[in-house]
Structures are given as structure tokens and as C-alpha cells.
Amino acid sequence: VAAPVGAQAADFAFQGAHIFPESFVQTGQNLEEWAKRVSEASNGRITFNIVHGGALLSLGDHLDGIAGGLVDVTSFYPIYFPGEFQVEGALTNIIDIWSEEAPDLEGVTHIHSTLHKEFPAFAAEYENRNMQMLLPLPADPYVIACKTEVKSLADLEGRKMRTFGRYFPILQQHLGVEPLTVPGPEAYQALATGLVDCVYSTPDWIYSNSLHEVAPHVFIPAPERARPQLFATAVVAMNVNSFNKLPDDLKQIVLDVSEDMKGYIGQSMEKVYDTALDNLSKANGATRNYMSAEDLATWAERTPNLLDQAAADLTAAGYPGDEIIARYRELAAAYIAGEWPAKQ
């Protein structure tokens, strides 16, 4: 619950929901921080009561819940609804292994927000479900956790790996593994029974779900830090009717707080990545190895460039796919070069 101490009675008391535990930083703690900042900036005129842990909305119904106004605000995962969020869903399911360098999580947050503003196709997907996207919430970068140690690309050959989504199976197939679709809640059992040998996910998710108990061997698919997805997998989203109840000054406060938090969000998730990797290293028999630059180049060379594929797929579906991907690449290059966004 976010409300400043000693504030006046709220003019707008909004209901929030979160499908995972509050302790989950990406979409729990960051949602609470956003709500706290909005409440403080409005001097208590806006307050939030956020119910965590799927007690109010679950993974399967949190889209209908926010769209239908059961709640006013939520951490929404477009990655779980690729049919309705085709544009956003494409970019959340790709990791750029073809460029020499990729943006960090702060860069992901800035790029996600900017493309939303520049291409109406993104906002239209939210408007179709009566939502407004306010703040991207990127995941910590994906790593590989296996039941036995992995030191190189060759060690992955023939292993079975959990997958999901449209583009991840392609990325994983060219690691030399056999991708198998396994729902997240079943990952532990799938590893324990040998249905899969490895998972490909964020270190925080791996640790939070205790997968390190059965898969303590971490392989970072990069020479140093793992690379993030092109887009955030989740966002702070508000029901449009709820947002429109606010007078203009309070609407602006919500928008300003969301804009100002982009740097904070990226930095908080970089810390989550580091902390989770440290936690995974404490597992019994744990190992951690890194993909060599040579293996990364080999992986990229034998994998179709999924940014190009996404551009073609989006164009075929009637979206400005070529323009979106070209602009993504332009912003990513400018961010990496330190030329964008302008330092304040």
C-alpha cells in the first residue's frame, strides 16, 4: 500500500494487483515504488492498494482484470498474450546476439518507452484492451541453468531445454539444444524428472522458483554480462477509464513520475541480475561459466537474425515492421555510443 505519511484524504483511491509475490523486484517492488512516488508527488490525492501474489488477479486473467476495470493498475505482462500484443510481443521475445554490443536494461527501458511514443501501433494494442502503458519493467537478462555443468556451446549439444514464445525456440535451437515448451510452474518438476536438462530464463526467476536445487550449473550466454531482451517483458499499465477520471494536473503527475523512473527501473534490475547470480552461486555444487566470444559469434552466425525476421513478420501482419526495427537499431546504437538520451 502506497500513501505518504500525514497526507490528506485521497481524492482517488485506486486498486492495484500483481500476479507474483511482492518480493519479486521486476513487477512487485517496482510497482510499489511507482505507486509510492505517484502518491507522494500528488500529496496524497492519489493512493493505491496493491494486492500481490495472484490473490486478486492471476497470470491467466490479469489482462481481462485490468481491461474490465476490476483493478485500476497492474504490472501487466504482454509477453503472455502474443495474439493480442503482436508488436510488443515480438520485441519482448528476442535477444540481440548479432550486434557487437546490446543496450543495458536502462537502455531497454528508454527504447521501449520511445518506440511507444513514436509508433501508434504499440499504444493501439493497449487501447484495444482499455489500457494505457505507463512504464516499461524490463526483466533481468536470461541465463542458462542446467543439471550438469556447461562450459561451452559444444556442451549444450543435444540437451533438452525449456522454451516458450515465438522466437526463443529459434534462438535456442541454434544453441544445439532441443527446445521443449514447458509452462513456468512445471519447470522444477520437468528438470527433476529429466523431461528437460536446462532452462533459459532470468537468474531471479530461476532462484525464486528454486530451480537451482535441481539445475545448479549456470552458463552465461555471453563473454561477460548476459544480453537483455529488446523490450521489457512487463509494464505498469492503468485502466483507461481510471486514468481518465483524473484531472489534468494529476494525469500529468502520473506521466511525469513514470517518465522520471526509467533510469531507476533499469538500474534496479541490473542489481537484481547481480544479486540473483550471487545467490545461484551458493547452491550445492554450483558452477558458473561464460560463453566465449568465439562461441557467441558461432551462435549468431548459425542463427537467422531475428530482428530481421520480426521486421518481416510484423510487416506481413500489416504493421510498420521495417520502420520499427530500423528505429530500434538506431536508438540502440545511439544509446550504446552515449549520444542518447540527453543527459539531464
Indicate where each model-derived feature is located:
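N-terminal signal peptide c-region/cleavage motif recognized by signal peptidases
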Residues: 2-4
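N-terminal secretory/targeting leader peptides
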Residues: 8-107, 121-344
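N-terminal FAD-binding dinucleotide-binding subdomain shared by FAD-dependent oxidases/monooxygenases
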Residues: 112
